[in-house]
């Protein structure tokens, strides 16, 4: 069902619907209703590493209720991850932390399927998704950019 997918969403963007976040669902109902619709239609997906990063029970439930398509990690994605962490952006993963970074897998999956990344991470940090996407010519946007792209006016 990847053929209909257009976007891959990061944990930071998913979390932004929480009541204490910038794009809280109680205020941005139409945005989240549209995202719900696009997740249900598999236009917005995520990858298994990003899904496993989600610790928030409300977001886990939201993903399940919406039927979030979670793309698996395969050899091509692994190869893309290797390229990202060894040549494109060595700062993306903190190897001293001794844990996997869902960010590299998210970007690698976006590259494989030609997806646009949706994230709320800072565009100015070298350890963040937007900088790496820029280096790899992968389209990346925050939720405001997403709203503009789909023509949503509040």
Predicted regions and their residues:
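PIN-domain endoribonuclease scaffold, especially VapC-family toxins
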Residues: 35, 44, 48-97
